[in-house]
Amino acid sequence: YTLDAHTRRMLAGLRHPVRIELFYSGSNPELDGQTRKYAGRVKQLLGEFQRLAGAPVTIVQSDPHSASAQGAAEERGLKAQITSMGELWFFGAVITSPDLPERQPQTIPFFDYREEPRLEYSLVRAINALWRSHPPRIGVISTLPVMEHIADRQLKPTWWALQQLMTDFELVGIDPTAGKLPDNPPGLLLIIHPNAI
């Protein structure tokens, strides 16, 4: 793997140790070759993270094949998959920092090989989330109905693109007719304005 420059900077700047618990049902004989190959790539990428980190990165691998281990994996947010024979198997991770036990563990419920282009991003996002006590705030200004609202007596959801942002940021709707920003302004403004209007 050749890591992105941003990833390298983030890893070099780590100030606290990171523990990555990798749950992989590698002993299950029914796992297909594509999953096994992808597992090798995930482990290789985690090894690169470990090698380049400015603080210790511990990788602990477990193979949850007993019912109790599988139940514990599900309780920690991992998403079970089912083989053609009806057996559960897992391939995900829980990321924590021993120095920051009060912080919410970050879970990657399932490593899907179809999402490989986003693998590095998913790991970086999970590690970065450990250090934030509060998500950064983004103000959203738009005359379009981009945020959750009620129309025709129905609740209309937030636009999909903004829902994706909400996984890492707190979005604050700002009235486009307001003459000034709120007293506690967000650190970033997102102005959504269609070009043709």
Regions flagged by a language model, labelled:
Residues Y1-I197:
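Short, surface-exposed patches at the edges or C-terminal ends of soluble domains, predominantly
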